[in-house]
Amino acid sequence: MIELKVQTVTVDIGGNFTVLLVDKEKEKMVLPIVIGALEAHNIVMPIQGATPPRPMTPDLLKTAIEKLGGVPEKVVITGIQGNAYYAEIHINQNGSSIVLDSRPSDAIALAVRCDIPIFMNKWLVEFTYDISDIKF
C-alpha cells in the first residue's frame, strides 16, 4: 500500500470539487478524487482548524466509533469501478479488527479528524498523475 495525505481540495470553473491526495513519502504522485461540495466542506473544515456549531456527519461517525469502544486506525482507498472510487475505514475495537465500506470522501473526512493515515492499494497508481502536471 502507498500512504497518502491530503494536498488540497480544489474547485474548477464548473463548480466541481476535487480532493487531491499526494503520496506522503515523495510528494510526486497525485490521486485526484472528485467529490461534492458538502464532502469538500467536511474535509477542509478540520484542516483549517474550524469547528462547526453542530456535529457534521464525519464528527458523528467519529464520536459513534469512539463511544462504542472503537479506535479508527487507517483509511484505505481500495479500488475504482467506472468513475467511483471505493474505500474502507479500519477500526480496532478491543483487539478485534473491523472494516467498514465507505465512500472515499467520508473516509478522508474521518481520517483528517482522527489524524489517522490514508493509504491506497498499489495497483491504483495507474490512476495517479505526476504532481508537476497539476495546476493548483
Where is each model-derived feature located?
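Divalent-cation
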Residues: 1-136
